[in-house]
Structure formats: structure tokens, C-alpha cells
Regions:
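Surface-exposed, interaction-prone regions used to assemble/regulate multi-protein complexes
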Residues: 1-166
Length: 166
């Protein structure tokens, strides 16, 4: 997979998992597996599912730039996988910036001295799996996401129409 395609895939995966959380991890720079809790999408595959697994293959760069809290603390940079994923990170957005995907995250655990930050990643390949380890393509994941948001939009429109009739 060429580097630009890999960046686009990483961006697309993390954009789809908006509001999901990075809960756990295992692996290393060669193969890193993240557990992403995103129940509203996972349960569309199987009602009992709450998570997905994202595998990064051959990581070239991975770092986390936290938003210090309080803001006057010295800025730190996490480059160790252990440090990067020590707290649960809530996924807000993802975009390509230079040679990285910049994933903006919140972090709500007051035990840590930061309240979120930006996760920068670049790897050779990214793959997504459901809870039974069935691989999902980006297109399949995108379809699941679009169907969910179309249903939400339809429910909102229906609710507005019903309120207008009263």
C-alpha cells in the first residue's frame, strides 16, 4: 500500500470512529492492535458487539502531544506506546497533516495532567476487525456509519414533523 493511501485509510477509519474511545492496546511498532469502543456502530454488525479492533502495521511514527491541564504545566510529548495509551482517548476527528494523520482526542480521567491532545500516526497499513476478528474494509465500515447517521437524521426529521403537526 502506498503511503498516501495508508494515510487516507487511517484518516477515514478514525473519522468514522468519531466519539469512539481507544480503550486498550497490545503490540509494538511492527504490529499494534487497538481496541476501539464504538458501540453505536459495532451493534449494527451484531447487537452484542461494542467494539472494533484496529491494527497498524509497520508504524513509522507514533506520538501524542497532550493538552496540559492546567495549561501552565510544562509541555510534554509521548513517544512510547505505553505512555501514549495510558489513558482512554476519545476520538474527535482525524485529518491528514504533512506525512501524518492527526487524530484529535479528548481525555477525561482527572488522574492525568492532560485533558486530551493530538495523536500523530504514520504506518504502512491499517486494518479494521469486528469483535469476532472478521476484517472489515473501509467501504464496509463507511456504509455501516452512513446507514447509522441516515437513520438518526430520519428520526430527527420525523420528530420535527410530528412536533410541527401538534
Amino acid at each position: 500500500m502506498d503511503n498516501q493511501k495508508a494515510l487516507e485509510d487511517i484518516r477515514d477509519v478514525f473519522s468514522i470512529f468519531h466519539d469512539g474511545t481507544i480503550e486498550t492496546w497490545n503490540g509494538n511498532q511492527e504490529l499494534l492492535k487497538l481496541k476501539i469502543d464504538c458501540e453505536y456502530l459495532a451493534e449494527r454488525i451484531d447487537k452484542s458487539y461494542a467494539s472494533f479492533y484496529v491494527k497498524f502495521e509497520k508504524i513509522e511514527s507514533l506520538e501524542f502531544n497532550p493538552w496540559m491541564n492546567p495549561i501552565n504545566q510544562p509541555q510534554i510529548l509521548f513517544t512510547s506506546i505505553v505512555d501514549i495509551f495510558q489513558a482512554t482517548l476519545e476520538i474527535l476527528s482525524a485529518e491528514i497533516e504533512n506525512e501524518f494523520v492527526k487524530i484529535t482526542c479528548n481525555q477525561h480521567n482527572l488522574y492525568f495532567n492532560y485533558c486530551g491532545g493530538t495523536l500523530l500516526v504514520n504506518c504502512k497499513n491499517v486494518k479494521v476487525f469486528d469483535e469476532k476478528n472478521n476484517e472489515l474494509t473501509i467501504d464496509e465500515l463507511d456504509k455501516i456509519c452512513n446507514e447509522y447517521w441516515n437513520e438518526v437524521n430520519d428520526q430527527i426529521e420525523k420528530s420535527i414533523i410530528e412536533k410541527e403537526r401538534k
